Amino acid sequence: MALQTYGGFTAQANSMTGVEFSKLYNPLHLKRVTQMMMFDKYALAQFIPANSGVKTMFCFRYRSLKPATTPLTEGVLPTETAIVREKVDYTVAQYGSFIKYSDQLDTFDVDNMKAQFTDILGDQAALTGDVVIRDVISAGTRVIYAGSATSRATVISGTKLIEVGDLKLAALNLKNARAEKFKAINSGSTKIGSTPIRSAYVGIVHPNVVEDLRNLTGWKNIEDYAYTSDIMENEVGSWGDIRFVENTNAKVDTAGAKPVYITLVMGKDAYASVSVRGKNGTEMIFKPLNSGGVENALNQVGSVGWKMYCGAKILNELFMVRIESVATLDVGDLIRYADNTGTVSDATTIE
C-alpha cells in the first residue's frame, strides 16, 4: 500500500487525498496508550510571578535549634544562640511541541485530525511536566541500594530485589528526619485544592516492582484495607507507614545489564513543582491555514501546538529517599503506541 506524506506526518494514502477509499471509514478512535501523571500530586506548588524579570527565585529555611537544657546562673548572661539559615533556589524553563498539517489534508481527510492532535499534544504536555519533575527528584542524595548492595552496579550484579529491610530503612530515615506524613494530596491539574488521605508516607513505584512488594511479609493490598474511602489514585497497597502508588512513568535506569528501578519514598514538602503565576497551565496554540506571512504565502500549512513553564526542586533531601532495585518480573514495554515504538499492521507515521 502506498504511503504519502503531508506536513508533519505520513498518512495512509491512495492518490493525492491521503484517504484510502477501498475500505469504509469508521470514525471511532481506538484508545491509545497514555502514561499516568503523578509526580506533581505530591509536590509543594511554587510560582514565579509573571513579568518579574527573573526565571529563578529563592526561599530560606531556618534550621531548628537544640534544646537549651543548661540552667541559667543568676546574673550571668548565657552564650548567645547561633541560627543557621539555608537558601534554596528554584527555577523554571519553557517547553513546547507542535504538529503541522497541510491544506490538502484539512480538505480531503475523513478524520477530524486537528481535534486528535489537540488531545495527543495535551497528553504530551502533561507527560513532559511529569518527566521534568521525576528526573529532578530521582537524583537526590539519599539512596538505599536494595538487599544491602553498596552501589547501583552491585544491585545489578547481585540481582537485588526490594526487601522488607529496605522499606524499614526508608521509613526510619524519614521518621528520624521528622518528615511529616501526607494527610492530603493535590487534586486537579492546577494544583488548587486537595483530597484528604490516611496519614502516611508515599512511595511511587514501577508496576514491575509492585509484584515484588506483594511477596513481602507485612504487605497489605488495598482490598484488605479496613477503610477504602480515601484510597489514592493508582494506590496498590501499603507496608507499615508507607502507602504505595504505581506509575509506569517511574524512573528506570537502563544503562546497565539489567534495568534498575527507582522507588521514591517521601514525606510532605520534600520537593516543589515550579511554574509561572498566571501561566501554570498549558497554553494550546492554534495556527490556522491562513496564518503567517510570506512563509505561508499560499495558506498551505497550519499547526497545533503547546507550550508551558515547568520546573522542580528538591526542598529537603532528608524528607525523601530512593530505593534502587531490580525486578523479578522485568516486563518491558512490548508495544508503546504512545511513543511510536510499536510495530502494528497498517500503522503509518505522520510526517
Region spans (language model):
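Structural recognition of the beta-strand scaffold that forms the well-ordered cores
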Residues: 58-60, 100, 202-204
